[in-house]
Curated annotation (Swiss-Prot):
Database matches in InterPro entries: FAD-bd_OxRdtase (IPR050260), FAD/NAD-bd_sf (IPR036188), FAD/NAD-binding_dom (IPR023753), NO_rdtase_NorW (IPR023961), Rbx-bd (IPR041364)
Gene from which the chain derives: norW
HAMAP family: NorW
Cofactor(s) annotated in UniProt: FAD
Assigned keywords, A-Z: Cytoplasm, FAD, Flavoprotein, NAD, Oxidoreductase
EC number, as in UniProt: 1.18.1.-
Family: Belongs to the FAD-dependent oxidoreductase family.
Subcellular location: Cytoplasm
Name of the featured protein: Nitric oxide reductase FlRd-NAD(+) reductase
Gene source species: Aliivibrio fischeri (strain MJ11) (Vibrio fischeri)
Function, in words: One of at least two accessory proteins for anaerobic nitric oxide (NO) reductase. Reduces the rubredoxin moiety of NO reductase.
């Protein structure tokens, strides 16, 4: 009997890999181990569940059981993988030992919750999985005032979604502007204004210091001596790859699980994919690099070593009141910007020292120009 491909994790990366494998091979044995129900869903949709008034059940596209049947996999639901033995090519899960031919770590990431003072810290909510959405949905529905920690991609999307759902929202961000790791301040300012127009209180260059319980809700204090009285607090302060299993198995781990161009870790026959993987020194928690990684890894697992090649990729900021799209390098080592701003939005092009287009950002109605600029970017790079 052939030994199986074993995948730890049942998120987007894991299931995209399975779908890709099954397009060319319907028979090779695949086992999936997950500590949740294994339902198939699109995680980015979680940033918009409140304005759309969706329940956890409505986010699911296929139940775990239906997915397992449709894609011919053995799904080990609600199963905790305790350890990996790279030398023996085994994993231990719920006390049982399983042998693999190839092992894929698709363990995902978790939301970083900074260390705050106060007795309310344990009540800080996170929204990074269907399981977490199920756990916090009623608390969010019952809340009138919500504070979101972090004005990056997820935090900004979530704050606007909650505002569109009728909540009073405060967004606290340590940097001087929103999406600071993605674009300069002059581009994100209109997005900040769009948030404010929806009623979001945007508090920049400030950090949450303490979260304390009150008789009803919480008192949040910041480094700039602001105090907010809210019904709940959500952390969107970034994602941290889940690397504990890899670390305990003595795999090379830096920010994420370090992989080579074939997505293989420092151990033979063990690969990493998705939010947990560190590729060329970067953790790329976006759909397009995960899709491309899954396509390459599927070929490798089926016997054809395939190196991952990552082109320029488009990122969409899903803020419906002020949509943003960007690609290429838009945050570091920009020699000059060419910026056109009018009532339709912003079109900003980034150039290097050789006057080559290296990236762009378009906003609002200007997003219709994104694909033309994307083609130009790919032509010059």
């Amino acid at each position: 009997m052939n030994l199986p491909i074993v995948i730890i994790g049942s998120g987007f990366a894991s299931y995209q890999l399975i779908k890709t494998i099954r397009r060319t091979n319907s028979d090779c044995p695949i086992h999936v181990f997950t500590n949740d129900s294994g339902d198939d869903y699109n995680k980015p949709d979680l940033s918009h569940v409140f304005s759309k008034q969706q329940s956890p059940e409505e986010v699911v596209t296929l139940s775990g059981g239906d997915f397992a049947e449709q894609y011919n996999v053995i799904l080990h639901r609600h199963t905790l993988v305790e350890s990996i033995n790279p030398e023996q090519q085994t994993i231990t899960a719920n006390g049982e030992q399983y042998t693999y031919d190839k092992l894929v770590l698709a363990t995902g990431s978790h939301t970083f919750v900074p260390p705050f003072h106060g007795d309310g810290c344990e009540d800080i909510l996170t929204l990074n999985s269907l399981k977490e959405f199920s756990a916090i949905q009623q608390k969010i529905l019952d809340a009138k005032n919500i504070l979101v920690i972090g004005g990056g991609l997820i935090g900004t999307e979530l704050a606007m979604d909650l505002a569109n759902a009728g909540k009073m929202v405060t967004l606290v961000e340590p940097n001087s502007h929103l999406l600071a790791n993605m674009m300069p301040d002059f581009i994100s300012l209109p997005l900040e204004n769009a948030c404010k127009e929806k009623g979001v209180t945007v508090n920049l260059s400030d950090c949450v210091q303490a979260v304390n319980k009150q008789e009803q809700g919480y008192r949040v204090t910041t480094s700039n001596c602001h105090s907010y009285y809210v019904d709940c607090v959500i952390s969107a302060a970034g994602l941290k790859p889940n690397t504990q299993l890899a670390t305990e198995a003595n795999l090379m781990v830096n920010r994420g699980i370090v992989v080579d161009s074939n997505l293989q870790t420092s151990a033979n026959n063990i690969y990493a994919l998705g939010d947990c993987a560190e590729i060329e020194g970067k953790v790329m928690a976006y759909l397009q690099p995960i899709l491309l990684s899954a396509n390459a890894l599927a070929k490798t697992l089926l016997g054809t070593d395939t190196a991952l090649a990552l082109p320029n990729m488009m990122v969409k900021v899903k803020t419906p009141n002020y949509p943003v799209q960007l690609a290429g390098n838009t945050s570091t080592d920009i020699e000059r910007w060419s910026v056109d701003i009018d009532t339709q939005g912003v079109c900003a092009k980034a150039y290097d020292v050789n006057n080559q287009l290296t990236g762009f950002v378009v906003t609002n109605e200007r997003v219709k120009n994104a694909f033309t600029l994307f083609r130009e970017l790919n032509t010059t790079n």
